[in-house]
Amino acid sequence: MLNYQQPDASGHFGRYGGSFVAETLIHALDELKAAYARYRDDPEFVAEFKSELAHFVGRPSPIYHAARMSRELGGAQIYLKREDLNHTGAHKINNTIGQALLARRMGKPRVIAETGAGQHGVATATICARYGMECVVYMGSEDVKRQSPNVYRMHLLGARVVPVDSGSKTLKDALNEALRDWVTNVENTFYIIGTVAGPAPYPEMVRDFQSVIGEECLRQMPEMAGRQPDAVIACVGGGSNAMGIFYPYIRHEGVRLIGVEAAGHGLDSGKHAASLSAGSPGVLHGNRTYLLQDANGQIIETHSISAGLDYPGVGPEHAYLKDIGRAEYVGITDDEALQAFHRLCRTEGIIPALESSHAVAYAMKLAPTMRSDQSLLVNLSGRGDKDIGTVADLSGAEFYDRPSSRGEKVKQ
C-alpha cells in the first residue's frame, strides 16, 4: 500500500466512482474539478482552511484513552478520537469549511446540502452564517422527526430546511432532491455534499478535507499509546468520517482498517443499511459503488436506528478498499449500538452519537479478543445530544419530555 494513489484522473477508484450525471451538471462538475485542482495546494487557500480549523472548529481534536471501559472489557486499550468536541459537535464541519471556501472563490452565493442526522446540515448552515451565504438544506421528513433538535439549530443559523416526503423519506431522498435543485440553479449554486459519495470530484475532495482527522491521529497516537494502533475503527454510512481517519493510515500496513455498517435488525432481516456487507455494485447519485438493490437494480429501503447511517450506498473508495482487502467491513445491530451508547455514557461520561455508537460497539466486541498491550483507535465522529429523544424513547424512559414551542410538555 506504499504506492496507494487513488482516484485516477477520471475520478475512478478501480471500477468504482466516476461521474454519472445529467448533462446539465457536466459543466458544473468540470468547473468544480478545475477549481479544486487550482486551490487544493494554493498556499493562501490552505492557510485559510487550516486557520478556520484551528480557530473556528477548535482543532486538533484530542485523543482520549477510555481507560475504565478498557479495564472492564479486558484486552486491548480503547482510544477515542474526539470529533464530538468539534464546533457543531461532529466531524462534518471539517468538510463544509473546505467546500465553502471553494464556493466563495468560485463566486457561488447560494449553497445547498443534504442531511440525514442533521449534523452536515448544521455544519453547512453554520459556515454559511459565518460567510453570509444563502443556505438551503434538504432532509427526509422521517429524519426531520427523529432529529428535531438539529432542524431547529439549522433554522437558528438562518438556513431554510426543506422536508422531503418522497420514497423512504430519509437521506437517499434528500440527496435526490438536492441534485434536482442543483440542476435547476447550477449557475449560482454550490452543492456541498456531506459524504465521500456522489460524482467526481466529491469523493476525493471530501476525503481530502476530512483527512485532517487521520493526520492528527498519526501524530497523537505515539504520544498517547507509544505507537500507532493495531486497528482503526469507524462507522460507515456514506463513509466520510471513516475515510477521514482511514486515508492517512492506508499506507501503514500493520494497522487494520475496520468500517462498521448499520446492521439494523440484523443482516438476515432485510432491515438494515449495510451495503458493503450485503449489497452489490451499481450506480446511484452519480457514482458506481456497492448498493442495496433488488434483482432488477431498484434501490431497496434501508433501516437503521441512526439517521446518519440510513443510506443504501457507500462512498466508492470504501468499495475499492473492500475489494482489494485493505479495509474490512462489519455490521452492528440497532440493539448493539444502543448498548454501546449507554455503556460509554456510564463508564466514560461521554454521550456519543448513535452513528459513532456503532463503532464503539464493535470495539467492545473486538477488544476482549486482543492483548492488553494492543490498542484500538475509534473515531468518535459526533456527540449524542441530537439522539437523546430517540434513545429515551427506545429505552422506555417515561420521564423524558421536551418543551414544545408553546412551553408545554410534549411526550417523546
UniProtKB/Swiss-Prot annotation:
Pathway: Amino-acid biosynthesis; L-tryptophan biosynthesis; L-tryptophan from chorismate: step 5/5. Its EC number is 4.2.1.20. GO terms for cellular component: cytoplasm. GO terms for molecular function: tryptophan synthase activity. Keywords: Amino-acid biosynthesis, Aromatic amino acid biosynthesis, Lyase, Pyridoxal phosphate, Tryptophan biosynthesis. It catalyses: (1S,2R)-1-C-(indol-3-yl)glycerol 3-phosphate + L-serine = D-glyceraldehyde 3-phosphate + L-tryptophan + H2O. Transmembrane segments: none annotated. The modification N6-(pyridoxal phosphate)lysine is found at residue 92. Its cofactor is pyridoxal 5'-phosphate. It comes from the Bacteria. Tetramer of two alpha and two beta chains. HAMAP family: Trp_synth_beta (MF_00133). Belongs to the TrpB family. The beta subunit is responsible for the synthesis of L-tryptophan from indole and L-serine. This is Tryptophan synthase beta chain. It comes from Methylibium petroleiphilum (strain ATCC BAA-1232 / LMG 22953 / PM1).
